[in-house]
Curated annotation (Swiss-Prot):
Organism encoding this protein: Reovirus type 2 (strain D5/Jones)
Keywords annotated in UniProt: Capsid protein, Host cytoplasm, Host cytoskeleton, Host-virus interaction, Inhibition of host innate immune response by virus, Inhibition of host interferon signaling pathway by virus, Inhibition of host IRF9 by virus, Interferon antiviral system evasion, Viral immunoevasion, Virion
GO MF annotations in UniProt: structural molecule activity
Gene Ontology annotations for the cellular component aspect, listed alphabetically: host cell cytoplasm; host cytoskeleton; viral capsid
Function according to Swiss-Prot or TrEMBL: Minor inner capsid (core) component. Displays NTPase and RNA 5'-triphosphatase (RTPase) activities. ATP is the preferred substrate for hydrolysis. May function as a cofactor of polymerase lambda-3. Associates with microtubules and plays a role in the formation, structural organization and morphology of viral inclusions, where the assembly of cores and the replication of viral RNA occur. Together with mu-NS, recruits the other core proteins to these inclusions.
Cellular compartment(s): Virion; Host cytoplasm, Host cytoskeleton
Ion transport recorded as keyword: no
InterPro entries the UniProt entry points to: Reovirus_Mu2 (IPR012494)
A Gene Ontology BP annotation from the UniProt entry: symbiont-mediated suppression of host type I interferon-mediated signaling pathway
Protein name as annotated: Microtubule-associated protein mu-2
Similarity remark: Belongs to the orthoreovirus mu-2 protein family.
Superkingdom classification of source: Viruses
Subunit structure: Interacts with protein mu-NS; in viral inclusions. Interacts with polymerase lambda-3; this interaction stimulates the ATPase activity of mu-2.
Length: 736
């Protein structure tokens, strides 16, 4: 059996359910054994009743996990005193688990109100000792749903429940008049059985469910057109909060299922549905529908070549893992000899990009992980290599599960991780007219410390001199580092004990203000040295703890003109590593592959097509009438780009039909002009409610991971006043 959610309530007849499906574009079979409708009228009553005492979000977030294919019921118990009266009148229904002394008293045909032993037994008696599972007015909605998903009968002391009908344990006269019996559609009279769920192939209900992979939501639903406000509220929250784990099913695919046809699938999601249902399928091939987030990668085999006195020798054989084929083709890498250093000893840009995009190196002799020494001074340095081959070609998904919503990205890398160099390389990359990662889209946690007077690193330096009892920075370095530049554990521990309050009391307050300000100015990439920096600053973006295949401490030692010198930076590096959480790092390449590879893939698909029909933007829309009230010219509506999209024309046409307007924000259009062309003013965006789920943008389309918020001005008129507006997302393209 499968469950399909459709946002409407009809009578509990298969013919009505079939008509409902057809109204949403589904060609349904006329066999009533195929389709069964679950009447969820009573759930609407429960929702309305529950919202008086619980947060709407808590109730909806719980109900979305209800397994509607599991038969269950709440059994409403009378108040304890009335329950005992019922037992006294009907001794045969007293449960076996009741204390035998209490059972014996209840079977006596006399007035027990003045029986001291009976009253003592009553006071000791707990409903939870006899009836399990038991929910009450203090039970959370999620616990209620978990209970009815796992049991056929859940006992309750309250009628304020959600997700299943209520069956009366006793005749109605035993219940308090204060209990609400206005919920007639929820209450099953005493002695009447619950109608069983039919054994149809498809059960149609009102509310989406995440309880099982076989629970689907019809994708052709227009949320804004749902007439019932409670159902509309439910769908709006589920679509915004749980969008990435909902199982959408298209009318065409459901039609094929109902008509018992071989399924025609055209996307990874549809293929997944066919596999879940164990149904045969064939893939509809289309050049326009290519999953650009599935990327070909290989392992690059190379040898470290040493040349001495004209003689060539191989000192080490390495494997560079999980390198994108598209980047290898972009660089033009072949089986040949390469010098990977510039004249100044630094790595070439292409080698740095290649290694950063990888999942590290393996020494083929020891089969252990190998870290590259950034120094150009022997021993154990790499200057010349010979690429000997490519192996283990495979396909990987570069869209991580954690990137569920379109939000800023916090990238945590240790000091000495070549951030400046790799950002310079990415700043120069442009694909399909879109810059991969403009430098203005990147902020660094160092900027927080540099805003302080004195700077954070200078303040730390002066305080550490006092802890070490020295006057100079050189003496401080000698005090904490040994001759081999490895810190003395006890002394480094003393410095760390003072580092924590400095980071908490000095750095964190400034950081909170900095990130609140910078993240309202754009969906930016933020670099930090420790994830604790961002966590303590209430950073709300995706947080990625990353690592690179280089010895970062050595890179620190060869960088000059840093605060306190390279040795003090080394000490700070040790402290930041201690400051970090215990979360396991992932390779920096996993983020870089997401930034670069889909765009290179898309370029192959649409590189020769007209840019006007393969380009689109999603942004915040402000009607020109609102702008004119604040002195703007009103030549056109205001539009602040949120996401830049490149995709084939047919994919853009599909994206155009999606419900973008369900996401809203407060947009502050400033009077601060950006230098250069085109003419733009800066804007700030504070998103209200939920961020846009990444799933809303098709896997057949590329979108910008970062964005600086600007409002474009197509005219030369004077600018207006800085003002705030309520705005919703709209889709904009040149398509007719």
């Amino acid at each position: 059996m499968a469950y399909v959610a459709v946002p409407a309530v009809v009578d509990s007849r298969s013919s009505e359910a079939i008509g409902l499906l057809e109204s949403f574009g589904v060609t349904a079979t006329k066999e009533e054994s195929d389709v069964q409708y679950q009447d969820h009228d009573y759930v609407l009553d429960q929702l309305q009743y529950m919202l008086d005492g619980y947060e709407a979000g808590d109730v909806i977030d719980a109900l979305v996990y209800r397994n509607w294919l599991h038969e269950s019921v709440y059994c409403l118990l009378p108040p304890k005193s009335q329950l005992l009266e019922y037992w006294k009148s009907n001794p045969a229904v007293i449960p076996e688990s009741v204390d035998r002394r209490l059972r014996k008293r209840l079977m006596m045909k006399k007035d027990l109100r003045k029986d001291d032993e009976y009253n003592q037994l009553v006071r000791a008696f707990k409903l939870s000792d006899v009836y399990t599972p038991l929910v009450s007015s203090s039970t959370s909605p999620m616990t209620m749903i978990q209970s009815i998903n796992q049991n056929q009968i859940v006992y309750s002391t309250t009628d304020r429940v959600i997700g299943a009908r209520i069956s009366l344990y006793a005749p109605r006269k035993y219940y308090s008049a204060t209990l609400s019996f206005t919920l007639n559609r929820c209450i099953i009279p005493y002695g009447k059985n619950v109608a069983p769920i039919g054994h149809a192939r498809f059960n149609i209900g009102t509310f989406p469910s995440l309880a099982s992979p076989k629970c689907f939501v019809l994708s052709s639903v227009d949320i804004e057109s749902i007439p019932n406000e409670f159902i509309k509220l439910f769908y709006q929250r589920v679509r915004s909060v749980h969008a990435n784990i909902l199982n959408d099913i298209s009318p065409q695919l459901l039609s094929d299922m109902l008509q018992r046809k071989r399924l025609r699938v055209s996307s990874p999601n549809e293929r997944k549905i066919a596999q879940i249902m164990h149904l045969p399928y064939h893939v509809k091939r289309g050049a326009t529908h290519v999953d650009v987030y599935r990327v070909d990668v290989v392992d690059v085999l190379f040898e470290v070549v040493d040349i001495k006195d004209g003689l060539r020798s191989v000192s080490r054989k390495l494997t560079l893992q999980t390198v994108p084929v598209s980047v290898i083709e972009l660089i033009g890498l072949e089986t040949a000899d390469y010098c990977i250093r510039k004249e100044n000893g630094m790595f070439t840009d292409w080698f740095l990009l290649l290694t950063m995009l990888s999942d590290g190196l393996i020494d083929r002799r020891t089969h252990s992980q190998y870290l590259i020494n950034p120094s150009s001074i022997p021993p154990d340095v790499i200057i010349n290599i010979y690429v000997s081959g490519f192996t283990n070609r495979r396909v990987i998904d570069v869209m991580p599960e954690m990137y569920d919503f379109v939000k800023p990205i916090g990238a945590v890398l240790p000091k000495g991780s070549f951030k400046s160099t790799i950002m310079r390389v990415l700043d120069e990359m442009e694909v399909l007219g879109v810059r991969i990662m403009p430098r203005c889209h990147v902020v660094d946690s160092d900027e927080v410390g540099e805003r302080m007077q004195p700077t954070f690193e200078h303040a730390v330096m002066e305080i550490y001199k006092g802890i070490a009892g020295v006057d100079s920075l050189e003496e401080l370095i000698n005090w904490v580092l040994g001759p081999d530049l490895i810190p003395h554990d006890e002394r480094l521990g003393k410095l760390y004990q003072s580092f924590l309050p400095l980071a908490k009391d000095l750095l964190a307050p400034v950081a909170r203000h900095f990130y609140e300000e910078s993240l309202s100015e754009g969906r930016l990439l933020t670099f930090a040295h420790a994830d604790s920096e961002l966590l303590n600053a209430n950073y709300f973006g995706h947080l990625l703890r990353l690592k690179i295949p280089f010895i970062t401490e050595v890179n620190l030692m060869i960088r000059k003109n840093r605060e306190g010198g390279e040795l003090f930076q080394l000490v700070l590096s040790y402290l930041y590593k201690m400051y970090a959480t215990s979360a396991q790092p992932m390779w920096f390449g996993s983020l870089l592959r997401l930034m670069i590879c889909p765009w290179l893939h898309m370029e192959k698909l649409i590189g020769d097509a007209d840019a006007a029909i393969t380009s689109a933007e999603v942004g915040w829309h402000i009607p020109k009438e609102h702008l004119m009230q604040d002195g703007w010219c009103g030549c056109e509506d205001g539009f602040i780009t949120y996401v830049v999209i490149r995709a084939p024309k047919l994919v853009l046409e599909e994206l155009r039909e999606k419900n973008w307007g369900q996401y809203h924000a407060q947009v502050i259009v400033t009077d601060r002009l950006e230098v250069g062309e085109p003419r733009r003013v800066h804007a700030r965006v504070v998103i209200k409610g939920n961020h846009m789920p990444s799933k809303l943008i098709s896997r057949y389309a590329c979108f910008s991971l970062t964005m600086r918020y600007m409002m474009h001005l197509t005219c030369g008129h004077s600018i207006g006043r800085s003002s705030a507006y309520g705005a919703r997302l709209v889709f904009r393209s040149s398509l007719a």
